[in-house]
Amino acid sequence: MRKLTSFVCGTGAGLAVYYLQRLRDPQATVNNSWTNSEKPVDPWALWDTNWDCREPRALVRPLRNSQPEEENRYNAELEKAKAKKARHIILVRHGEYLDVGDSDDTHHLTERGRKQAEFTGKRLCELGIKWDKVVASTMVRAQETSDIILKQIDFEKEKVVNCAFLREGAPIPPQPPVGHWKPEASQFLRDGSRIEAAFRRYFYRAYPDQEKESYTLIVGHGNVIRYFVCRALQFPAEGWLRISINHASITWLTISPSGNVSIKYLGDSGFMPAELLTHRIPRDAKNVV
């Protein structure tokens, strides 16, 4: 009996010490999942709210004091600087083309590339979008793709903006590097500055006086579109080459009034027959011209 009493007392004391220690342990309460934490796993995951330099707080004079008149002035200016509507930017890669000759003038769409552009034009027409602006790269393959699409959608060809900033190029050295494609450092410097300028030209939240959602169609190139996607979503831009998009595919990005950016489609080409799905440049004219 004495042994049993000693055992019970010892066990009880041990349990008491254990639970007391658990209560004192700062890690006694944990989240069920890392996604429940309000703190990002990596500081680089933090969203830059002023990425386009149009965050309302960055556009108005800061508070000079805590007087009601000054606070009213600040709040009124802040409200006036806020965007009200979203901007939708739809990016279309050119159709398949034949890489022959030393100049852009010889890089015309293949027959398959023209069919791809026709399907894309029909798809954009089916979406029923009222376009506010259509922009096309000045390279031949993008111009030909744009011309075919314009026959399908409700937009006047004379209003198309031709932009040399959108021409294909090498935006930034990719990570990881690839052995089959190694442009000179000077090409990255030249093309990268131009493509970044194109991004800043077309990607920004709406102006405060925009009263309805806007839709901009941009017909461009694979490298440029992939770079735009990484920049818009604030992913490391060096990762652009990890993305693959088909010829004449549709990528849809939305910039909300708050400045947040979301992607609706990435390289969508599911509206085409399987035999028209391509993403590489054919090196032989046989059966493609």
From Swiss-Prot:
Segments passing through the bilayer: 7-23
EC number: 3.1.3.16
Subunit description: Interacts with Pk92B/ASK1.
Subcellular location: Mitochondrion outer membrane
Name listed for the protein in its UniProt record: Serine/threonine-protein phosphatase Pgam5, mitochondrial
InterPro entries: His_Pase_superF_clade-1 (IPR013078), His_PPase_superfam (IPR029033), Mito_Ser/Thr_phosphatase (IPR051021)
Gene Ontology cellular-component terms listed: mitochondrial outer membrane
GO biological process: positive regulation of mitochondrial fission; positive regulation of mitochondrial fusion; protein dephosphorylation; response to anesthetic; response to heat
Function: Displays phosphatase activity for serine/threonine residues, and dephosphorylates and activates Pk92B kinase. Has apparently no phosphoglycerate mutase activity.
Gene3D superfamilies attached to this UniProt entry: Phosphoglycerate mutase-like (3.40.50.1240)
